[in-house]
Amino acid sequence: MSFTTRSTTFSTNYRSLGSVRTPSQRVRPASSAASVYAGAGGSGSRISVSRSVWGGSVGSAGLAGMGGIQTEKETMQDLNDRLASYLDKVKSLETENRRLESKIREHLEKKGPQGVRDWGHYFKIIEDLRAQIFANSVDNARIVLQIDNARLAADDFRVKYETELAMRQSVESDIHGLRKVVDDTNITRLQLETEIEALKEELLFMKKNHEEEVQGLEAQIASSGLTVEVDAPKSQDLSKIMADIRAQYEALAQKNREELDKYWSQQIEESTTVVTTKSAEIRDAETTLTELRRTLQTLEIDLDSMKNQNINLENSLGDVEARYKAQMEQLNGVLLHLESELAQTRAEGQRQAQEYEALLNIKVKLEAEIATYRRLLEDGEDFSLNDALDSSNSMQTVQKTTTRKIVDGRVVSETNDTRVLRH
């Protein structure tokens, strides 16, 4: 049996590539300020652009940045196109003015001799109008640019407004709580004032009763004709006492009011400080949240692309597996068919070999008998019957050698070698 082995060699040529320079890219914020200035006559146009640039490598989080750069470029291109159109319009108006001036001169030359009328003041008016037209064109371009800048500033202020609105709502909630405390303080103050009024009325009533009792006693003394001298201390001035009490209560109320004002002013200052601190922390947290959201969006986009790539690879793998499975089934069918044919061929070969061996034995026997008969006929009387019997009883061995060459499970060639051995 001989076997052939097929080997396939794949060679890959690598060619060195030249160094490729990749231009550096920067991510710029969407906010920018631009100004346009055009000189007289449409010449010397100058465009100045100021942007706040934040350096950053272009990576997975650079999609929003690239969109902002594209928007800026489109905006500046639009402004430049508008400015160019205005300048072209100014130039066309100047050309039209020169054409009209030439027509006026030709008309004057045809109608009458030169120098009849002085058109200098008209030329001055024309120059003034031309200057006004150019100034208006420049003003229009400047206004358009200011409108665009105002739109960008409005967007910035909108963001600031939303931030300040959140801060204002927080402060309003704090103020609402403080107003409740102030209302409670006012209620307490009203209660104290009511008590003061009640005490005043009670004091007046007691003073009136005291005066009536004094008058009654004086009348009794006068009617009895007695003179009674009482060594008593001088009566106190009730109005002065009331004034002192009122002053004390007012001083106490003023002191309480000042203490409350001071306390709530301090509380408001502390609340304002806390609100300012919390606002800064909130802004930092919002910035961090924005960056995290941008990173999350970038990662989600990468994940979606990876999922799509994985799905495509799985589909390709399924197609390849199905194709190779079909090929393997086909090859297995061919192999089974070849194995069955090989088994049939081997069985047929064995059967033919057995038949050939039987026929060969018969042939050998016949040849031996023919040789014996030939010797009997040729030798005649010299060949005895015993010799013929010995010749016929002699033992013969037939040696058969079969050589087959099989390549890839298929019989390519077959060689048979037969030898007869006598004993």
Swiss-Prot record:
PTM annotation (N6-acetyllysine): residues: 124
This protein's UniProt keywords: Acetylation, Coiled coil, Cytoplasm, Glycoprotein, Intermediate filament, Isopeptide bond, Keratin, Methylation, Nucleus, Phosphoprotein, Ubl conjugation
Region entry Head, spans: 2-71
Chief place of localization: nucleus
Induction: By retinoic acid and IL-6.
Region: Linker 1, residue numbers: 108-125
Residues annotated as domain IF rod: 72-384
Ranges where the record places region Coil 1A: 72-107
Tagged with keyword Nucleus: yes
Residues under site feature: Stutter: 264, 324
Modified residues (Phosphothreonine): 295, 397
Site (Cleavage): 231-232
Covalent cross-link (Glycyl lysine isopeptide (Lys-Gly) (interchain with G-Cter in SUMO2)), residues: 73, 240, 363, 365
Region (Interaction with DNAJB6): 236-384
Function text: When phosphorylated, plays a role in filament reorganization. Involved in the delivery of mutated CFTR to the plasma membrane. Involved in the uptake of thrombin-antithrombin complexes by hepatic cells. Together with KRT8, is involved in interleukin-6 (IL-6)-mediated barrier protection.
Further comment: There are two types of cytoskeletal and microfibrillar keratin: I (acidic; 40-55 kDa) and II (neutral to basic; 56-70 kDa).
Family: Belongs to the intermediate filament family.
Name recorded for this polypeptide: Keratin, type I cytoskeletal 18
Phylogenetic placement of the source organism: Eukaryota, Metazoa, Chordata, Craniata, Vertebrata
